[in-house]
Amino acid sequence: MLFKQIRIGKNGVPFTIYKLRTIPEGATIPNAWGAFLRKSKLDELPQLLNVLKGEMTLVGPRPDVPGYADLLQGDDRIILTLKPGITGLASLKYRNEEQLLAQQPNPKQYNDEVIWPDKVRINKWYASNRTFLIDLQIIFYTLVPIPFDVDAF
């Protein structure tokens, strides 16, 4: 029932991230239960194992799949100085990322040209400005999904 995937962690070190499987073996889309798990973000709960292992924190930039972290250049690499988090500012802004991408004629291109660069911008800001209070606010807005402007941080 666990889905494992390699992600890039602090200092660019790969690690195995854990999630609840939302797409049945051999299928290409989630079933109703999987869709519920994704929408509610409950599929992320096994990442508490990653937190206990010291690979992740509760709040921080989401860990990228290999390939994207390699694209970080110059001061963008400040993101890699942090442990990745289960939730973060970019996660909040793009909490409906799947639906947003599904509306695009070329989802990968939209991700690469619009979403990912914006996530880098947000995560750089977080890396330079994070505080305990900001982390508490991020946790609050993760648990209580009310609208707010991430860019107001």
Outline where the language-model segments fall.
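Short, charged low-complexity intrinsically disordered segments located at boundaries
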Residues: V65-P66, I78-K83, E98-Q104, N123-W125
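A hydrophobic, helix-centered structural microdomain
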Residues: M1-E25, Y126-F153
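Short, glycine-rich, amphipathic interfacial segments at transmembrane boundaries or analogous
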Residues: M1-F36, A90-W116
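Short helix/strand-capping connector loops at secondary-structure junctions
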Residues: I115-Y126
